[in-house]
């Protein structure tokens, strides 16, 4: 089994975006703790399967972040299931999850499932629009959601998602301070070693996504920046 509490760095690949085989090899052998496959836009079963089969050639843990029921495929090491705690639509908190379990529950091992308590904080990102997230939150609201994740729902992961923009490091610091058992993931705006170190100072795990497609060489540098 994989222990996510030991992770520090994750690359997130969008199956709807292009990456060369050479880039994928460099990424998978970079020393990152896992490769997460997922996205919020036009994710298809075929694209997920194609990308998974390529990542599977390497030893790095391969994880599917489930964003649509139609793109759940077998063969991943872990399945990350987001529940968007600050969504105004209950489908994104538990409704879609019930549908997924109804269809695939008997096929999925509980040991392979990791539930992420998402808090989406960039009002302009696709994920916020898709999930109808309430992004007008102050730090006390965010800490309250973190406590909901850990103390009420006993979730293994609380995920601060800024998706496309760099968040406030003080917010990450204060959020981390209220978590004892739940692992804090941070994603959004990490584009180079400097921004990686800034967010990794307080988050347990940083997720690097868009930078892979915008400046690949700088994205690669984020691994050693946080793992040494």
From Swiss-Prot:
KW Transferase (keyword) present: yes
GO biological process entries: glycerophospholipid biosynthetic process
InterPro entries with a match to the protein in the record: GGGP/HepGP_synthase_I, GGGP/HepGP_synthase_sf, GGGP_HepGP_synthase
Xref: CDD domains: PcrB_like
Statement: the UniProt record of this protein carries the keyword Ribosomal protein: no
Gene Ontology terms for molecular function: heptaprenylglyceryl phosphate synthase activity; magnesium ion binding
Task of the protein: Prenyltransferase that catalyzes in vivo the transfer of the heptaprenyl moiety of heptaprenyl pyrophosphate (HepPP; 35 carbon atoms) to the C3 hydroxyl of sn-glycerol-1-phosphate (G1P), producing heptaprenylglyceryl phosphate (HepGP). This reaction is an ether-bond-formation step in the biosynthesis of archaea-type G1P-based membrane lipids found in Bacillales.
UniProt protein name: Heptaprenylglyceryl phosphate synthase
Organism: Bacillus licheniformis (strain ATCC 14580 / DSM 13 / JCM 2505 / CCUG 7422 / NBRC 12200 / NCIMB 9375 / NCTC 10341 / NRRL NRS-1264 / Gibson 46)
């Amino acid at each position: 089994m994989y222990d996510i509490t030991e992770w520090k760095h994750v690359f997130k690949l969008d199956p709807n975006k292009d990456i060369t085989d050479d880039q994928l090899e460099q990424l998978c052998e970079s020393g990152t703790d896992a490769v997460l496959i997922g996205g919020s836009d036009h994710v298809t079963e075929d694209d997920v399967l194609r990308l998974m089969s390529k990542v599977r050639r390497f030893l790095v843990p391969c994880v599917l972040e489930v964003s649509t029921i139609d793109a759940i495929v077998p063969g991943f090491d872990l399945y990350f299931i987001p529940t968007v705690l600050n969504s105004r639509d209950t489908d994104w908190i538990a409704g879609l999850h019930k549908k997924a379990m109804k269809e695939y529950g008997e096929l999925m091992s509980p040991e392979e499932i990791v539930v992420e308590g998402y808090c989406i904080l960039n009002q302009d990102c696709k994920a916020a629009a898709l999930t109808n997230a309430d992004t007008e939150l102050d730090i006390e609201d965010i800490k309250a959601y973190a406590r909901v994740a850990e103390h009420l729902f006993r979730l293994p992961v609380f995920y601060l998602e800024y998706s496309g923009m760099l968040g406030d490091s003080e917010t990450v610091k204060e959020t981390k301070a209220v978590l004892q058992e739940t692992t804090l993931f941070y994603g959004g705006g990490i584009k180079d070693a400097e921004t990686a170190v800034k967010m990794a100072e307080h988050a347990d795990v940083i997720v690097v996504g868009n930078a892979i497609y915008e400046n690949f060489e700088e994205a690669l540098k984020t691994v050693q920046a946080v793992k040494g």
